[in-house]
């Protein structure tokens, strides 16, 4: 059975031509995020606290303030909904005052492509996209340590199989001053989009 091992020492990781994915500055990125509660981060900033339970948090444990940042984005609304509400498979439009936000990065993002051959060449497997979160975070820490100037990771959602982005510290300067769109999930227009996404993946809408 294919397993995801712990990563080697960061200096053992290698890059070859074609291992990086480029996300152009005209690409629309989506994020579904809380605006109330603990450890809330505004839409255009990285989270410098962690690691949380999220798959690719690059911060060293134990959880706490860090000089390494992270933020997650998808290329479609359905993947945002699937990922954020996966525990209960129900979309709560009130708890945490969630917002749906879209923006275009201010420059091209250069990301390590975890959907190609890089994982297997470096001792991992495609499970780095879908495996146990603690092991994926160990790989994220090793990658971030090896290439601190890398903007982050290009990977696929374990829920939908669609592309996702984990942005690391170097990508912190790529948020524009204003979003293309940012509305609460309770907004009638946003609720319609989210309801359609929830129906598509079989989630309830609260």
Identify what each model region corresponds to:
Residues 73-75, 83, 155-156:
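Short His-Asn-centered micro-motif
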Residues 77-91:
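Short active-site loop/helix that positions an aromatic residue
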Residues 74-79, 133:
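Alpha-helix initiation and capping sites
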């Amino acid at each position: 059975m294919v397993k995801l091992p712990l990563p080697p020492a960061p200096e053992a990781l290698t890059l070859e031509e074609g291992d990086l994915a480029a996300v152009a500055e005209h690409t629309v990125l989506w994020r579904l995020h809380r605006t109330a509660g603990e450890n809330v981060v505004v839409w255009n900033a990285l989270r410098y606290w962690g690691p949380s339970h999220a798959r690719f948090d690059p911060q060293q444990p134990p959880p706490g303030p860090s000089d390494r940042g992270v933020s997650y984005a998808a290329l479609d609304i359905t993947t945002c909904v699937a990922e954020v509400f996966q525990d209960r498979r129900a979309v709560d439009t009130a708890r945490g005052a969630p917002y749906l936000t879209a923006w275009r990065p201010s420059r091209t993002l250069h990301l390590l492509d975890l959907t190609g051959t890089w994982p297997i060449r470096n001792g991992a497997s495609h499970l780095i996209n879908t495996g146990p979160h603690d092991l994926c975070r160990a790989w994220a820490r090793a990658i971030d340590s090896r290439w601190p100037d890398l903007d982050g990771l290009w990977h696929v959602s374990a829920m939908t199989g669609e592309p996702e982005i984990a942005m690391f510290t170097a990508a912190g300067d790529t948020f524009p001053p204003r979003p293309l769109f940012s509305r609460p999930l309770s907004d009638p227009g946003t609720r319609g989009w989210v309801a359609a996404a929830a129906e598509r993946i079989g989630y309830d809408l609260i």
